[in-house]
C-alpha cells in the first residue's frame, strides 16, 4: 500500500515541474495525476513509477523480450500465459514486471502488484472477497516468490496450495500472471501438489523467462 501523503506529494511535484503549464495546472498534469493514482491503486512501488523499460540497463535479450511483450499486450492478454521472470537479485525482474503493469494501466486493463507474502496474508485473512478479486484482475504481478519466506515444510505446502488455487483459476480463465523469483525453478519452492500441478500446467500455460547478466545494483546503475 502506497502512503497517501507520498501519492499527493508526487502529484504536486509533477504539476510544479510541468513544462507545459509551469505549475498552474493543465490537461497534461491532470492526466498524469490520474495515472499516478492508478499506479498507486495497483500497488506499483513508487521506485518504478518513472522508470522506462527503454532505459533498462540489464541484459539485452531479457529487455527485448519484455519490450516485445509490452508491444503485444493485447495478444498476451488473449493468450493469458503465466510469465515467470527468474534470476538472481538485481537483474531487473521487478522493473520488468512493473513496466508491463504500467502499460496495462494505459491500455485500460485492471492491474495489481503484490508480493507473495502480502498475497498469502490477504487471501488467508478474514476477507474472502480478496481471493475472488485476485482471480478476476486482468494482469497480476506476484513478486518475491522465494523459498526463504517459507521456513518449514508445512508452511511451504500450505502456501503452495493457496497459490496453486489462484494460479489454476487464472490460467483456466486465460488471465496473465507475472511471477518474479530468485529461484531458477519456481516449482521447487513449494513442492508437493504445487510442484505436480505447476509441472502439469507448464507446457500449456507457463513461460519461463530467465533474467541473467550482472547485478546492476552493485554497479550503482538504475534498474
Predicted segments with their positions:
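Short, surface-exposed polybasic-and-hydrophobic patches located at secondary-structure transitions
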Residues: 66-80
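Walker B catalytic acidic pair
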Residues: 143-145
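Walker A/P-loop nucleotide-binding motif
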Residues: 78-97
Amino acid at each position: 500500500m502506497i502512503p497517501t501523503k507520498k501519492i499527493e506529494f508526487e502529484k504536486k511535484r509533477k504539476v510544479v515541474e510541468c513544462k507545459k503549464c509551469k505549475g498552474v495546472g493543465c490537461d497534461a498534469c491532470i492526466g498524469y495525476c490520474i495515472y499516478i493514482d492508478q499506479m498507486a491503486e495497483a500497488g506499483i512501488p513508487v521506485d518504478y513509477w518513472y522508470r522506462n523499460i527503454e532505459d533498462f540497463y540489464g541484459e539485452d535479450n531479457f529487455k527485448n523480450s519484455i519490450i516485445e511483450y509490452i508491444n503485444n499486450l493485447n495478444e498476451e492478454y488473449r493468450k493469458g500465459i503465466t510469465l515467470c521472470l527468474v534470476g538472481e537479485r538485481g537483474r531487473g525482474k521487478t522493473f520488468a514486471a512493473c513496466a508491463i503493469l504500467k502499460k496495462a494501466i494505459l491500455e485500460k486493463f485492471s492491474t495489481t502488484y503484490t508480493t507473495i507474502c502480502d498475497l498469502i496474508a490477504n487471501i488467508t485473512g478474514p476477507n474472502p472477497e480478496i481471493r475472488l478479486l485476485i482471480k478476476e484482475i486482468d494482469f497480476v504481478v506476484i513478486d518475491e516468490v522465494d523459498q526463504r519466506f517459507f521456513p518449514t515444510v508445512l508452511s511451504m505446502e500450505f502456501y503452495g496450495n493457496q497459490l496453486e488455487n489462484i494460479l489454476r483459476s487464472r490460467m483456466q480463465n486465460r488471465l496473465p500472471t507475472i511471477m518474479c523469483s530468485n529461484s531458477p525453478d519456481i516449482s521447487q519452492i513449494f513442492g508437493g501438489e504445487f510442484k505436480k500441478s505447476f509441472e502439469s500446467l507448464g507446457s500449456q500455460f507457463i513461460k519461463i523467462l530467465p533474467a541473467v547478466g550482472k547485478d546492476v545494483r552493485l554497479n550503482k546503475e538504475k534498474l
